[in-house]
């Protein structure tokens, strides 16, 4: 993984990144660590432990600090257990990034598949935020960064369930920022455009080329193009950003 060259001072900060065993989550975890934060690399199951450990190993070998931590964020019991592990420690940064994606026309979309996607994206964001806020309120500081998507704004055929979940995360973030109010805790989100992650790895080349042609920057983003937005929102420089959404998308959409 190519290292992001954005630099902020996160020395002494502690961060939890959900869905951090691959893709954007792994890149964000690595970038936070390379800027001084100690990072918990969340992954959902035993099947993803090896990938999470590889992310942790990369961080440690680069001189950073990280630990894997398992929880299926769609399951309340898992989230409560994960945060029980963190409860005695500060939590300065929460990145809600866990997500899944698959395409289906509405008439063929199974209810179980709809519920599972909503559970990981929206329920997971809610559950982790609820637990994190208890820590952040007690310490009177923190950064919450949720992962939405450019598609939440513009839609996409075959992804009605995915765009609905991401749109809900946008609204959740805005209301959360208002609820937090004057406290020195921020809630914002990042809405990436098309990014080369494992989700896009199986997309046929002709479709990827069509996506690329619609991007004024001339290419689909790498994960390193995305993480700068997360680093900024995690930093002290973003203290006056509340309920905002940054969308690194190469000019594909003006949001």
Where are these regions (language model features)?
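Short C-terminal tail/terminal secondary-structure segment
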Residues: 2-6, 154, 214, 230-231, ...
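Conserved glycine-rich cofactor-binding loop
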Residues: 14, 21-22
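Conserved glycine-rich Rossmann-like NAD(P)H-binding loop of the short-chain dehydrogenase/reductase
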Residues: 37-52
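Substrate-binding pocket helix/loop in short-chain dehydrogenase/reductase
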Residues: 105-106, 110-118, 200, 211
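Active-site helix of classical SDR
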Residues: 129, 165, 173
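Alpha-helical segment proximal to the catalytic Tyr-Lys
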Residues: 134, 178-182, 239
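Residue(s) in the substrate-gating loop at a strand-loop-helix junction
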Residues: 149
């Amino acid at each position: 993984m190519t290292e992001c060259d954005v630099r902020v001072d996160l020395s002494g900060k502690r961060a939890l990144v959900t869905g951090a065993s691959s893709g954007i989550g792994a890149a964000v975890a690595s970038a936070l660590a390379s800027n001084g934060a100690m990072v918990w690399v969340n992954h959902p199951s035993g099947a993803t432990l090896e990938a999470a450990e590889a992310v942790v190993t990369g961080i440690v070998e680069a001189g950073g600090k990280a630990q894997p931590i398992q929880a299926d964020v769609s399951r309340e019991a898992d989230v409560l257990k994960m945060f029980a592990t963190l409860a005695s420690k500060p939590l300065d940064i929460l990145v809600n990034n866990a997500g899944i994606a698959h395409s289906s026309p509405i008439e063929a979309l199974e209810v179980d598949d709809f519920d599972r996607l909503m559970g990981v994206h929206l329920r997971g964001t809610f559950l982790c935020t609820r637990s994190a806020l208890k820590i952040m309120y007690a310490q009177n500081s923190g950064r919450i960064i949720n992962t939405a998507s450019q598609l939440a704004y513009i839609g996409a055929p075959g992804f009605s369930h995915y765009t609905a979940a991401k749109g809900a995360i946008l609204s959740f973030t805005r209301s959360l920022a208002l609820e937090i109010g004057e406290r020195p805790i921020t809630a914002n989100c990042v809405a990436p455009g098309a990014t080369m992650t494992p989700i896009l790895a199986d997309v046929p080349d002709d479709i990827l080329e069509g996506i690329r042609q619609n991007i004024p920057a001339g290419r689909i983003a790498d994960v390193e193009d995305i993480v700068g937005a997360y680093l900024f929102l995690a930093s002290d420089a973003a203290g006056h950003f509340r309920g905002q959404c940054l969308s690194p998308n190469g000019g594909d959409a003006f949001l």
